[in-house]
Regions:
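Dinucleotide-binding Rossmann-like beta1-alpha1 core, especially the glycine-rich loop
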Residues: 1-46
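A short coil-to-beta-strand element that immediately follows conserved catalytic motifs
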Residues: 2-4, 88, 154-156, 238-250
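Helix-loop-beta segment of a Rossmann-like dinucleotide-binding subdomain
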Residues: 2-9, 44-83, 211-214, 268-273
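Glycine-rich nucleotide phosphate-binding loop and flanking beta-alpha elements
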Residues: 16, 120-122, 214
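Helical element adjacent to the flavin cofactor pocket in flavoenzyme catalytic cores
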Residues: 57-112, 116-117
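Central helical "cap/lid" subdomain
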Residues: 107-173
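Contiguous C-terminal substrate-recognition/catalytic subdomains in enzyme active sites
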Residues: 157-161, 165, 170-222
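C-terminal catalytic lobe of FAD-dependent flavoproteins
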Residues: 193-195, 201-207, 213-296
Length: 296
């Protein structure tokens, strides 16, 4: 299930609106993004006026959304059934060298081996990861249902809080000023890496995130104040009362010298690892480029 309806960034106040305006005046034109700046009146005309308490918006046209808990198993089934890919689950890969992979299910020889360990930097080739000084970030996430005033949301919704988090905005002068405002008014949002992202599910519910806590391991204990802050932000953005139906943690790699690393190990082995939050966005393209570069 793929939604191709773009995304919507809403400005809750004049400080956030200034960031959207600067982005539209500069980067939008320079980079050729397909997006429109929306006035307060334009925003009020969306979703039966339920977002009219915002003062500006930015509507992107090229963003795609999937429901990952269904899409990822569907991709696995397609690869197995349509393309004949063999998946060996419940197995640990313990060593890899020159096309030979040693696992708990036996040894496998390949013309070229691609090591894609996610945020596991210790099991395979730890000496390759150590110089990168990578960390792990742990996110608190919510799935929520409307209790009042349901909004027929058909695309991801963000607010100006995301403008201090995402690189397309965060280095703009107005975004630096916005960060100072947030630090002065609600420092716990920055301390916990909280910004608001609301994604509708195919079943009328909402995925709400997220927070960011960094370290060498994923801290196992959720902070209820963080969940409450995210739920309050989502309720305010949508003008609706929400009820949490599910909570979980997301974990991925973070920091390092770049968003991702592709490292040749030997003539028959390549490591490809993501250490930023854009894996769902660019991971398939990185995979295609890495395979093509190694085996043509």
């Amino acid at each position: 299930h793929v939604r191709a309806n773009g995304a919507l960034v809403l400005a809750r106040n004049a400080d956030e609106a200034t960031v959207l305006q600067e982005f539209a005046d500069t980067r939008l034109k320079q980079e050729g993004y397909r997006a429109d700046l929306l006035s307060a009146r334009d925003v009020a005309g969306l979703y039966d006026g339920q977002l009219a308490h915002h003062c500006m918006g930015l509507r992107g046209h090229d963003d795609l959304q999937i429901y990952s808990r269904e899409a990822l198993p569907a991709i696995t089934r397609y690869l197995a059934e349509a393309l004949g890919v063999t998946f060996i689950t419940g197995t640990l890969a313990r060593a890899v060298e020159n096309g030979l992979v040693g696992t708990t299910a036996g040894d496998f020889q390949g013309k070229h081996v691609f090591v894609c360990p996610g945020h596991d930097y210790l099991t395979l080739l730890p000496e390759r990861f150590a110089p990168l000084n990578l960390e792990i970030t742990r996110l608190q996430m919510l799935r929520a249902a409307f209790e009042t005033n349901p909004v027929a949301l058909d695309r991801p919704l963000l607010t100006g809080l995301s403008c201090v988090h995402y690189g397309a905005f965060s280095d703009l002068p107005s975004a630096h000023a916005l960060r100072d405002v947030i630090q002065a008014r609600t420092p716990m949002l920055l301390e916990n890496g909280i910004h608001l992202l609301i994604s509708p599910t195919p079943y009328g519910e909402l995925i709400i995130g997220d927070s960011h806590r960094y370290g060498q391991d994923a801290f196992p204990f959720n902070d209820e104040a963080v969940d409450n802050a995210m739920l309050d932000l989502a309720s305010q953005a949508l003008g609706a009362r929400l009820r949490v139906v599910e909570r979980w943690q997301g974990v991925y790699g973070a920091h390092g010298p770049a968003p991702f690393s592709v490292m040749p190990v030997d003539a028959a082995t390549t490591v490809a690892v993501m250490h930023s939050g854009v894996g769902m966005t660019v991971g398939l393209a990185i995979g295609e480029r890495t395979v093509a570069g190694a085996i043509g």
